[in-house]
């Protein structure tokens, strides 16, 4: 997860060997992607659903992908069935596909080698609510069978439902990592007052880290401690709640406020 321009797609391109990192290395299954024997049999990749030849049919796209990595024609039919593309749709030119259909085709291409890992950049783009529900079930089933899915998304509610672990990035840096439950538990206390400047000063003097967010101040301590400090400083609180009260969306906005365009504009 991360705001536009945070580096989500760049990170995925580094994982799949398309963009060299300035330092360090990215490993998949313990190796660089380029060092994997026949990578498509181990890692299924969809970074841009529109990156298909518009003049080919959906079936031709999958047939070419299957031949490239050495799998038989039955994988093509299985892939089409898996992503819900009918024979009629498979016979249409990609230029006539909707964005949602291109997403399904791209996912079929990623799955065609029966990989252990999927790397998917915004796989739910263009899907309607039913399609998003279907995508969630497909990826959850893949993971439950022992596979690993690395995906980026801006659909926070869907991520909260399906993800086992989150990596939140901003400006190319990891700002938080862990399960949804772990991240929400670490978020301290959300507070508003009649004099936020004075409250920040009082909390800072007490050695408590305070961050401004769209939902108010976020203090890295318990609500009881914030209330006590505010009382001692004679500051009236108008809102006091666990930092996790706003859920994943508020957590995301808080952690990435400094990197987002909206945060910089504010």
Each PLM stretch: what is its role?
Residues 79, 93, 215-216, 243:
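Residue-level "edge-of-site" marker
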Residues 1-151, 156-157, 161-164, 168-170:
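ABC transporter nucleotide-binding domains
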Residues 222-266:
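C-terminal coupling/interaction segments
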Residues 34, 53, 71, 157, ...:
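Short alpha-helical
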Residues 30, 40, 58, 171, ...:
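ATP/adenylate-binding site constellation spanning eukaryotic-like Ser/Thr protein kinases
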Residues 17, 40, 182-185, 211-212, ...:
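Short, flexible turn/loop "capping" segments at secondary-structure junctions
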Residues 135-221:
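ABC transporter nucleotide-binding domain
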